[in-house]
């Protein structure tokens, strides 16, 4: 059998969307090369932003220094991070839960085709974010729990959103 590797440069909800799209293309009778080519194109339309409340796991994984963690904890800062070319990149900072959710929701364009809200233990916050996105985008937002591996690296209070940009006409 033939194999084609597609590096999604993504995780969690973004990866979920690409895997689901691959399944749809398989079910529609797509060939291996057609499916891989479409996924290579579509992966550039998928985005993921996320945030955490507790900065300790970011410090332990080397993504944040001790001083920055201490100051961030005192000021109730919650970093907004994004996945860019397969790497976790700092985007901006928020203070408190309300601003954290507002800033995450602000990243998603109103015409997003598909939206996923990811969380591990923060179900209430995830539901609030999903409601905000449903109002803003008029789209059905899927809630998904992410696995413990992300929890180990980012913290179990991680909350994020992934979406697919609307297709160009």
Where are these regions (language model features)?
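Mixed-charge interfacial surface used for oligomerization/domain docking
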Residues: 1-4, 10-169
């Amino acid at each position: 059998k033939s194999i084609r590797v597609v590096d999604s440069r993504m995780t969690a909800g973004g990866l979920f969307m690409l895997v689901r799209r691959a399944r749809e293309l398989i079910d529609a009778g797509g060939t291996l090369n057609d499916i891989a080519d479409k996924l290579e194109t579509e992966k550039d339309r998928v985005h993921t932003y996320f945030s955490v409340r507790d900065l300790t796991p970011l410090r332990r994984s080397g993504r944040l220094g001790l001083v920055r963690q201490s100051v961030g904890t005192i000021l109730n800062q919650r970093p907004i991070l994004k996945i860019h070319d397969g790497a976790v990149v700092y985007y901006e900072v928020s203070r408190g839960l309300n601003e954290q959710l507002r800033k995450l929701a602000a990243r998603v364009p109103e015409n997003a085709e598909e939206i996923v809200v990811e969380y591990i233990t923060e179900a209430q916050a995830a539901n609030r974010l999903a409601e905000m996105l449903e109002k803003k985008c008029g789209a059905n937002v899927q809630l998904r729990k992410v696995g413990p591996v992300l929890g180990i690296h980012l913290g179990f209070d991680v909350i994020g959103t992934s979406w697919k940009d609307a297709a160009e006409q």
